[in-house]
Amino acid sequence: MQRILIVGATSAIAESTARRFAARGDALYLAGRSAERLQAIAADLKLRGAAQVDCFVIDARQFDRFAPLLQAASASLGGLDAALIAHGTLSDQAACQQSLELLREEFDVNAISVMALCGELANQFEAQGRGVIAVISSVAGDRGRQSNYVYGAAKAAVTAFTSGLRQRLYPKGVRVVTIKPGFVSTPMTAAFKKGALWATPDSVAADIVRAMDGGKAVIYTPGFWRPIMWIIRSVPETLFRRLKL
């Protein structure tokens, strides 16, 4: 049995991942903004076999509550073996171009809060000499594109941060997993036209669980995004700047 903290637990990907943890009898501590949604998810996870499920209401911008969150999770579960950081928003690129305040808010949620929380977790797991920190980044962070460069920049920051954190914690027995989903069919992407490259939250969840259980450092999910993003990163800047991406 693993004792797992899930932050952003009301997101579709996080909920699907939690269901897979519950099915094998793990103990879960859920954190998110909506108390009502957290309680509903917790009740469902208990029915699916979770050994224990408790909740903590928090907004990702409440940095001063990160330490109390980890303290509460550890006290509730009797310690932590792993954490999945899955919170975030899908930035409105056009709106961010018109509002520096909105741009800052989006970066706070999608990058700064993730890094701050990872920092708290890193210190705790380093002290105990073990643990897994899994963080949802995105393929959008591999190269900035005009359609979503605010979101992409935040995810690029998360990817770079987790890379450095992984190097720092490796000698301490702590694993850091960077998760890079592509297009995923969730309520957050409901307005988007779907196609062959789209994945379901459950298929992404399956990849996340395998990565957290195994030895992977960075995963693309679905896996076909790895060669796709290699191609996109390889396009010369003189050509790339002319593309409509």
Model region roles, listed by residue range:
Residues 138:
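Residue(s) in the substrate-gating loop at a strand-loop-helix junction
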Residues 24-41:
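Conserved glycine-rich Rossmann-like NAD(P)H-binding loop of the short-chain dehydrogenase/reductase
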Residues 178, 193-230:
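C-terminal helical subdomain
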Residues 10-12:
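Conserved glycine-rich cofactor-binding loop
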Residues 118, 154:
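Active-site helix of classical SDR
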Residues 46-64:
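Rossmann-fold cofactor-recognition segment
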Residues 82, 88-104, 147:
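Conserved mid-core segment of classical short-chain dehydrogenase/reductases
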